[in-house]
Regions:
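Carbohydrate-interacting/catalytic domains
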Residues: 1-219
């Protein structure tokens, strides 16, 4: 470690800034960086949705750092203290309230899918307080089949099931015989309104939105 928050090395930090400024003037470097990043973008966005769903459904209170309602590419302090465009977020929330998942997914670049999902989950937490209370315990669920390790799922209490994909960069669209057995009852995906029971195949579950939260019908 050549520099730190408590013991900064000004000369070293200035040399780093000069180096970064220099490479960013190179069209060849920019082109190679874009080629490197491009295949990471969509898997990264899906991971962001998965992490957000998990933190909003597991026991405890979800924490949101300012600005992370949309995609956030900042580093740790002080980089993550950039000004936040709250007017933009307020406008997107107003737009998102009435739109279906398909419309939210039509605007990936703005981060609308993440804000849309977050708004839905916050409303759900308000409507179904008992399902998110300390009495609703975490229970892991295990998938079956070829890609069982690429599904992360858990039950929250009796009425909620969260399901997200893992390792999506190398998965492609092929889930093969992978399925997730479900507890008894009829379950509705709160993002797409798809209704399932007994078991569900990830390829079907994630067809309308990249992650899923199932709610027991009639509960």
């Amino acid at each position: 470690m050549n520099t730190s928050w408590h013991e900064p090395n000004q000369a070293y930090e200035e040399s780093i800034r000069s180096f970064v400024d220099g490479v960013l003037q190179s069209p060849e470097f920019i082109a190679s960086l874009e080629r490197f990043v491009e295949p990471l973008v969509q898997p990264g966005r899906i991971n962001s949705l998965a992490q957000t769903l998990i933190k909003m459904v597991v026991p405890g209170l979800p924490d949101f750092y300012q600005g992370t309602e949309l995609w956030d590419l900042s580093l740790v302090d002080p980089d993550n203290r950039r000004p936040v465009d709250f007017a933009l977020r307020a406008d997107l929330v107003r737009r998102a309230r009435a739109m279906p998942a398909s419309e939210a997914l039509s605007d990936w670049d703005s981060g609308l899918p993440k804000l849309w999902m977050t708004a839905r989950l916050l409303a759900l937490r308000r409507e179904r307080e008992a399902d998110f209370s300390g009495q609703s315990k975490y229970q892991p669920l295990v998938a079956q089949g070829t890609h069982l390790g690429r599904v992360f799922a858990f039950r929250r209490g009796e009425n909620l099931i969260a399901v997200v994909p893992r390792f999506t960069m190398t998965l492609g669209a092929e889930w093969g015989d992978t399925c997730l057995p479900l507890p008894g009852g009829v379950w509705r995906n709160c993002f797409t309104d798809t209704v399932v029971e007994r078991e569900v195949r990830p390829g079907t579950l994630f067809e309308g939105f990249p992650v899923a939260l199932l709610i027991r019908e009639g509960a």
